[in-house]
């Protein structure tokens, strides 16, 4: 593909070389190919003094800006080209450049000020099939310029990408898109082999919970995977739905449960007589962070019966300082008037 591109570049240059600005552009292009960026820049500056509106020179300066890692300047150059010649395609060659770094930066520049032709959707769809993961990741980030209807299929496609960073980006952006229809795909990503991907899938699932109906999370409560169950229960609790409470309480009582802190925070949203005893028990958790959260939660719940426990923890010299401080704060909360 890239050998064909080289031939295309050569043909375009030969065609333009019949013009004086074309010859300067060709010379600058050769310098860029040789890595002589400073000399190429000087050549282009000389050319612009003679031909300030030259598209050929602007195209080479766009290339120079990409090589210099300055997509913002490249985007500005592309806009200048399009103002002079609206039918031009300033990104056609950069998007086919042999260098993945240039293709990636071209996508970034394209997204800063996307032209109408070719369509942004077609450009990003093609970039998502690029053999280099850097380019695919950049194309996923650039889906912000698309409508939700256009972006969601590309993001879901990226959840299956061979590159874990691309999958993680897709998981994060599915949450940012605020589209509850992505919930099933995100639940499947909780099984991803990479922890970074799983972390972003979890975060997006919880972010989407405020936009979704409980029914979107209920099937996951029946999953054989414990992580899937817990995340579904956390999401339901954010909707003040207690149908996952048993799972939250079990996770809080599990010394190896990695979601104990979040389960304490979520369980207190549910009006259920089993919650207070479970939160009280969490004040003796082996993890000081869990104990702190549980103490503050009891204070916020105005659990007067826990006052002796709080005082005991506050005066316990063997307890970590942050836990004693949390107990003191919980006692302060108990002394405050009960919200009506």
What residues fall within each predicted segment?
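Alpha-solenoid HEAT/ARM repeat scaffold
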Residues: 59, 72-75, 104-108, 137-138, ...
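Short inter-helical turns and helix N-cap capping residues of alpha-solenoid HEAT/ARM repeat scaffolds
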Residues: 98-99, 131-132, 162-163, 193-194, ...
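Alpha-solenoid helical repeat scaffolds
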Residues: 56-60, 90-93, 137-141, 172, ...
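N-terminal leader/linker segments that initiate helical-solenoid repeat arrays
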Residues: 14-89
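Amphipathic alpha-helical scaffolding segments comprising HEAT/armadillo-like alpha-solenoid repeats
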Residues: 41-42, 53-59, 72-75, 83-95, ...
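Bacterial N-terminal signal peptides
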Residues: 6-15
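Core register positions within helices of long alpha-helical scaffolds
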Residues: 64, 77-80, 109-112, 142-145, ...
């Amino acid at each position: 593909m890239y050998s064909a591109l080289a031939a295309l570049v050569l043909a375009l240059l030969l065609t333009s070389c019949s013009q004086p600005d074309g010859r300067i552009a060709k010379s600058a292009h050769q310098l860029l190919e040789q890595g002589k960026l400073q000399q190429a820049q000087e050549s282009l500056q000389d050319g612009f003094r003679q031909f300030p509106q030259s598209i050929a020179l602007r195209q080479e300066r766009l290339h120079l800006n990409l090589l210099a890692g300055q997509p913002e300047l490249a985007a500005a150059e592309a806009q200048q080209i399009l103002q002079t010649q609206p039918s031009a395609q300033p990104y056609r060659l950069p998007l086919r450049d042999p260098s993945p770094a240039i293709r990636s930066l071209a996508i970034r520049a394209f997204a800063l000020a996307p032209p109408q032709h070719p369509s942004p959707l077609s450009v990003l769809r093609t970039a998502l099939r690029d053999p280099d993961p850097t380019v695919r990741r950049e194309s996923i980030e650039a889906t912000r310029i698309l409508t939700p209807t256009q972006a969601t299929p590309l993001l879901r496609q990226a959840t299956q990408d061979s590159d874990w960073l691309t999958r993680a980006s897709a998981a994060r952006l599915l949450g940012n898109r605020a589209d509850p229809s992505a919930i099933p795909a995100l639940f499947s990503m909780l099984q991803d082999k990479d922890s970074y991907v799983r972390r972003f899938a979890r975060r997006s699932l919880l972010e989407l919970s405020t936009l979704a109906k409980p029914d979107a999370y209920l099937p996951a409560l029946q999953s054989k995977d414990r992580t899937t169950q817990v995340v579904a229960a956390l999401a339901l609790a954010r909707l003040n739905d207690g149908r996952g409470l048993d799972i939250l309480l079990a996770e809080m009582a599990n010394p190896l449960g990695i979601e104990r802190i979040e389960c304490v925070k979520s369980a207190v949203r549910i009006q259920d007589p089993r919650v207070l005893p479970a939160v009280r028990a969490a004040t003796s958790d082996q993890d000081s962070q869990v104990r702190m959260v549980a103490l503050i939660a009891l204070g916020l719940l105005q659990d007067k019966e826990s006052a002796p426990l709080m005082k005991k923890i506050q005066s316990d010299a063997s307890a970590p300082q942050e836990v004693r401080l949390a107990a003191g704060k919980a006692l302060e909360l108990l002394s405050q008037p009960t919200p009506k």
